[in-house]
């Protein structure tokens, strides 16, 4: 199999593009680097396509390795024919290779192998030949052998049937067709283990759906219900169709005396050997596809969350709400530095509201706080009411926003948080994190395990290695899309930069602490363990805002500096113009990109990227994202009435809809059917995490704390 051709066909790209990307990956280049700085080589493949290409490359190479292992094993047994070799080499999935290898795989002793040891294989072959003139039972008398524990003709016939059943089970073509029949016509059934038991799985207590139509979220929910011992799950296969197919394949002489025995063989082969394995395979395959779909949605949600626009230039009060232990506060300046921390007790059981307000008024006045970032955890509702009362009593124009606390407690108790804030307790660290999440969501959220951020579904049921890798790739893509400030970025942020490992990230911080600020990107080569290859991969994503070379503040890669200087001279600019932001109209001066690229001896796509960077240096792509909703008044769930129209923020997107924060401490659900008038396969076609949407209240259940919303207004 030509892997590059196969990948190109699957992804709908040219073979040359696939080959170039594979070559760069093999040379140790990262996906963000290839996507950003090797556009000429790959024909400008996006990071998403490159990720898919990488996944398929790993799978197909593993498949080729498996084929070679299987071929070697069969050849060693002296059973490899040219036809079998061709079939194995043409197989496109690991399941197909397994099916072909099944008859030759070293087996534990089975009923068939025991029957062969008893000398019953000739009888099996005779039955399969279907040319007997006597009944198979009569023929079986010739194989009675008490020494080998074949005492009767029935023993001999049963042994021969076992041999034939295993032969049918081992047939790769039969298995492939049965798998297809089951997927096309089979149903997944689920029933309650205890019909009286109350659970979140009650809708699956009497459930059936076609395997070919099952939605991913249903598969994951049913699997969890089975795991938690609420559900009994099985596949209802089209048994009659399958047995009819096997009979047609096996019984070539329907009127021969062997026909009835061969029908018994197909029934036994299917029920005892094939069906349990096919059910396991199909359920595993369905779960894996559902898991991959859920991971994709999780990744998209995480990407939107990480790419939320920073709220710059504001002094923020981070508020970690609680009851008994008090609300922890942290004042954070626009650079993220913690100016002050304290604890107030406005909530039960102490209810020291006036005292708390006095502390808050003092902090707002002293530090010129303009924004309060309130965590959405325990005591958040009570804290919000106090904030709203306070804002009505003070002259300062302060607003508040409720932020998702997910992962904050994990971070605040971590070794990283202890190193960052050794003088603070867990609550104060959490409050500081609340504030910083508003100021720079990406820089703060990278400190938290992506799985703890709370924008996925069923993440604890998934393959954790696969989930971690996928989410790490999302974080890596976001960090490199935005770029990092080399002189302020934490090790947590730096380790996601292309070509930078955890060890190198720590070494960069150590170098900065020992030698002061980086004055140029080239200084990175002085960092321990950061060699030329790592420098090539990371340099373009590192920014130095006040360095010696103004190009260090842009996304222009150092390998293109000479061409960039030549470009500036050709168009009548200098490097000083870049520093002074006097190159805003540079794109209008370029008449012929193709010719200019040839003159500069660089690719046209690279030239276009350089011009874009010079025109808007250090531009943050997050600026294009919707800004968060800032509030100054409170709304309760009991205040909601059907028909009310509100603005809200999408907090989570799942397969069947989206949860929207409308400011009442309970996110409302917009079902996929309520998103738009056209048919959509997935909510992500319409909304993303962080989107600001206008919604209308359909229904409210105060007791169950459920809100149904619609975007069809």
Label the model's feature ranges:
Residues 37-39, 128, 238, 321, ...:
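Short, ordered loop/turn segments at secondary-structure junctions
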Residues 30-31, 46-147, 481-624, 631, ...:
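Accessory alpha-helical DNA-binding modules that contact the DNA backbone or grooves
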Residues 96, 401, 407, 412-482, ...:
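Long, charge-rich intrinsically disordered scaffolds of nucleic-acid metabolism proteins
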Residues 18, 341-348, 371, 413-426, ...:
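Short beta-alpha connecting loops at secondary-structure transitions
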Residues 49-52, 59, 63-318, 322-423, ...:
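Duplex nucleic acid-engaging cores and interfaces of nucleic-acid transaction enzymes
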Residues 141-153, 207, 245-270, 274, ...:
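Low-complexity, acidic/Ser/Thr- and charged residue-rich accessory regions of DNA metabolism proteins
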Residues 180-188, 319-323, 377-379, 403-410, ...:
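A glycine-rich phosphate-binding loop feature that marks nucleotide/adenosyl-phosphate handling sites
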């Amino acid at each position: 199999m030509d892997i590059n051709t196969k990948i190109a066909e699957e992804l709908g790209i040219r073979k040359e593009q696939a080959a170039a990307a594979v070559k760069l990956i093999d040379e140790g280049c990262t996906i963000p680097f290839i996507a950003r700085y090797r556009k000429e080589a790959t024909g400008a493949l996006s990071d998403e396509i490159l990720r898919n290409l990488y996944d398929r490359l790993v799978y197909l190479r593993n498949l080729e390795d498996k084929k070679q292992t299987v071929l070697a094993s069969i050849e060693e047994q002296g059973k490899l024919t040219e036809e079998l070799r061709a079939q194995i080499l043409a197989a496109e999935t690991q399941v197909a290779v397994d099916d072909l290898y099944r008859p030759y795989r070293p087996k534990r002793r089975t009923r068939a192998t025991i029957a062969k040891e008893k000398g019953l294989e000739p009888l099996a072959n005779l039955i399969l030949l279907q040319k007997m003139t006597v009944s198979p039972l009569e023929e079986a008398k010739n194989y009675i052998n008490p020494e080998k524990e074949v005492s009767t003709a029935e023993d001999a016939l049963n042994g021969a049937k076992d041999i034939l059943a295993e032969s049918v089970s081992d047939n790769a073509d039969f298995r492939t067709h049965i798998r297809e029949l089951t997927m096309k016509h089979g149903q997944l059934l689920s029933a309650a283990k205890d019909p009286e038991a109350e659970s979140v799985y009650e809708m699956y207590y009497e459930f059936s759906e076609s395997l070919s139509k099952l939605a991913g979220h249903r598969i994951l929910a049913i699997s969890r219900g089975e795991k938690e011992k609420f559900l009994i799950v099985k596949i209802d296969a089209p048994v009659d169709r399958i047995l009819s197919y096997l009979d047609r394949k096996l019984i070539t002489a329907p009127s021969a005396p062997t026909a009835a025995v061969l029908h018994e063989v197909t029934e036994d082969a299917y029920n005892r050997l094939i069906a349990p394995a096919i059910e396991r395979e199909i359920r595993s395959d369905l779960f894996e596809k559902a898991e991959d779909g859920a991971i994709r949605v999780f990744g998209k949600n995480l990407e939107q969350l990480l790419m939320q626009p920073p709220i710059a230039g504001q002094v923020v009060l981070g508020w970690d709400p609680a009851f008994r232990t008090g609300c922890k506060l942290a004042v954070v300046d626009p650079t993220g530095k913690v100016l002050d921390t304290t604890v107030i007790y406005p909530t039960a059981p102490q209810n020291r509201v006036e005292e708390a307000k006095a502390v808050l008024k003092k902090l707002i006045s002293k530090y010129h706080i303009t924004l309060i970032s309130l965590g959405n955890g325990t005591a958040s509702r009570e804290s919000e009411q106090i904030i709203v009362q306070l804002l009505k009593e003070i002259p300062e124009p302060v607003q508040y926003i409720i932020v998702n606390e997910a992962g904050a407690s994990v971070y605040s108790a971590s070794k990283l948080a202890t190193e960052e804030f050794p003088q603070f307790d867990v609550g104060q660290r959490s409050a500081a994190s609340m504030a910083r999440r508003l100021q720079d969501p990406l820089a703060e959220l990278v400190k938290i395990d992506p799985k703890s951020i709370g924008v996925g579904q069923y993440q604890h049921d998934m393959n954790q290695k696969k989930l971690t890798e996928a989410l790490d790739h999302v974080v890596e893509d976001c960090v490199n899309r935005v770029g990092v400030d080399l002189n302020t970025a934490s090790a947590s942020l730096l380790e996601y930069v292309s070509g930078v490992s955890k060890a190198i990230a720590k070494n960069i911080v150590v170098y900065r602490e020992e030698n002061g600020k980086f004055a140029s990107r080239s200084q990175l080569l002085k960092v321990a363990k950061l060699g030329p290859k790592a420098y090539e991969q990371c340099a373009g994503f590192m920014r130095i805002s006040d360095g010696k070379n103004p190009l260090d503040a842009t996304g222009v890669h150092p390998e293109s500096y000479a061409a960039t200087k030549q470009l500036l001279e050709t168009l009548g600019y200098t490097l000083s113009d870049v520093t002074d932001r006097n190159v805003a109209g540079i794109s209008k001066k370029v008449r012929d990109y193709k010719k200019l690229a040839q003159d500069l001896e660089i690719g046209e796509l690279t030239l276009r990227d350089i011009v874009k960077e010079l025109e808007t240096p250090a531009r943050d792509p997050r600026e294009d994202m919707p800004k968060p909703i800032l509030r100054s008044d409170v709304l309760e769930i009991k205040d909601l009435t059907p028909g009310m129209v509100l603005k809200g923020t999408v907090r989570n997107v799942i397969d069947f809809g989206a949860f929207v924060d409308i400011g009442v401490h309970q996110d409302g659900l917009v079902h996929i059917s309520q998103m738009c008038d056209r048919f959509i396969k997935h909510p992500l076609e319409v909304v993303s995490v962080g989107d600001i949407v206008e919604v209308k209240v359909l229904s409210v259940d105060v007791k169950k704390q459920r809100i149904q919303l619609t975007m069809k207004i």
